Amino acid sequence: MLGGMLALAAAATFGLNSVAIRRGVLSGTVAQGLAVSIPVGMPILLVAALVSGGLGLLKILPASSFLLLAGAGVTHFIIGRYANYRSTKAMGANLVGPVHSSSLIMTLALAIFYLDEVLTPLRVIGIILILGGPLLSLCSPAVRGKTETGASPATFTPKLLEGYGFAILCALAFGASPILIRSALLNIEDTGAGAGIVGGLIAYTAAFSVLILYLLRPKHLRHALEMDRNTAKWFSYTGVFVCISQMLRFMALAVAPVTVVSPIVQSTGVFRTLFGWYINREHEIFDGWVLVGVATTIVGAMALTMSVGSVVDLVDLPDGLATFLRISWP
């Protein structure tokens, strides 16, 4: 019960983060977003590491784990977050969300080759649904720049080429980073919530170091500081929301199985759509095709992360179908 509640809270804050990003990039730039959101997360993780008593792990963490976590930090928080902000600025959180969910496919592919994961029929169905979500969204007249006769033009016109390009880059970065993190944590005995928080702190520190190098140039620092209070507010929200959501996810995984936590966290698309409707209605595209695309991707993500055993135990399936679902490769 506790694990499910923590996972649901993580999904909700991930959704809030997407909405806050959208508001921030309306008036600010991607570089400004990185300059605010990354430093905001560091003190939160430091306090969490102190409270959890996980800082002692720094003494026993192998050098290889430090390098893997640092690589994950640069990949996720610099490359991935930059691409996330660029894609969200170009075409909104609703359209990029299904593409970002395809990062699960990247994670699964890497896990099969490096962490001895397997491919099952249920996961294949999930991959097909995840890939189909963005295609369904493209059927929207508003996305294609068309409106019905007599209808007013959409307030927001997406830049599809830029948006999808950076959304794919974001999915690749977000898909690779969990493998780096998992590989790093496999090198230590304690892989509970404390280890995860310390791993996040190392990853954030590496990303912050790269950010500092970027801001050393005076013109970059001036640009980062040239934002109004409203923009700084929304970017600060993104830093807080994404940091809290990551910690909640690690806490959920510490007290509940992955098969319970991961499908619940994938419901972030529902929260992203709901919060976006209330906060960013004029800056997003909401129509039937887009919502169907979002829903298809969420179902696919849940299928991709659920274990076959949990499905067979939950649903009374015919023996032949249950046997088919248990097929695995390699």
Where are these regions (language model features)?
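Interfacial helix-capping/hinge residues at the ends of transmembrane alpha-helices
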Residues: N17-R22, N84-Y85, V96, L104, ...
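Membrane-interface interhelical linkers
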Residues: M1-Q32, V36-G71, R81-M91, C139-I168, ...
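Short hydrophobic/aromatic, small-residue-rich stretches within specific transmembrane helices
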Residues: A7, G200, S262-Q266
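Juxtamembrane helix-start motifs in multi-pass secondary transporters
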Residues: G33-L34, V96, G196-G200, V261
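Hydrophobic/small/kink-forming positions within alpha-helical transmembrane segments
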Residues: G15, L46, V74-I78, L104-A109, ...
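C-terminal transmembrane-helix exit sites in multi-pass transporters
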Residues: I105-I125, L135-S137, P141, V270-V292
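Short alpha-helical packing/oligomerization segments
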Residues: F250-S267
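Residue-level recognition of pore/gate-forming positions within transmembrane alpha-helices
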Residues: F14, I38-M42, S101-I105, I127-I130, ...
